[in-house]
Amino acid sequence: MCDDVGVGRIRPTVLKMKKMCETKERLLQVGFDLIWDSSYGSVSVDDICKRAGINKGSFYHFFPSKAELVVEAYEEHWREKRPAMDRIFSPQSPPLERIQNFCRMIYAVQKEKAEEYGHVCGCPYTSVGSELATLDEKIRARAEHLMNAGSKYIESAIADAIREGSVTVKDPVFASVTLQSLLCGMLVEARVQNDLKVLENLEGTVMKLLGAKAVAA
């Protein structure tokens, strides 16, 4: 009987906490999607709340400002993305195959988002980072951090490719930075032109940059 009473008291609290978590997750997802679809400056707190179906009081319960939501939303996006990155860049796969599959993932994601939003969205980190680079240091730093985190996967694959002799580049750090710049540039160009064709030869361009000696089919 006492246990039943205890459960009865605990259950509403658990349900309330679950609902709060779901509300916060909804705000993070909607905020991320809206800003990736358009821009940080064009999306207001009202826009996020309206799309999420959540009142502003709940928004400010979780986030002091739109900027704070963005920082957390981009961190959450990276946490969700990491398992796919770990799988693609698994050391069990040949290094060039890892890089190939990464390029294919980029194209697939851009194609999916273009179909969803009606236009090419580009890289979310590059877009918000460049937009706010001189306006919000916290967001700029977070965008840089997440871009660097992705670059580490590329650097590791290039280092393995150098060791096995499947590429002509010699410095994995320099090559990964150059490759990251290429990827960001092509994604920006695809967004500006609103044309996925810009990315159709992404894989081939990357392989040429690395001086790949053999490429898997």
Q: How would you name each of these model-derived features?
A:
Residues 26, 34-73:
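Helix-turn-helix
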Residues 97, 101, 134-162, 204:
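Amphipathic alpha-helical packing segments from all-alpha helical-bundle domains
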Residues 23-31, 48, 73-77, 81, ...:
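Generic hydrophobic, amphipathic alpha-helix propensity
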Residues 72, 86-121, 176-179:
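Hydrophobic alpha-helical connector segments
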Residues 114-138:
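Amphipathic alpha-helical segments used for helix-helix packing
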Residues 41, 109-113, 134-135, 160, ...:
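Amphipathic C-terminal alpha-helical segment
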Residues 1-22, 216-217:
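N-terminal intrinsically disordered/low-complexity leader segments
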Residues 121-127, 170-189, 205-208:
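Hydrophobic alpha-helical segments that form the core
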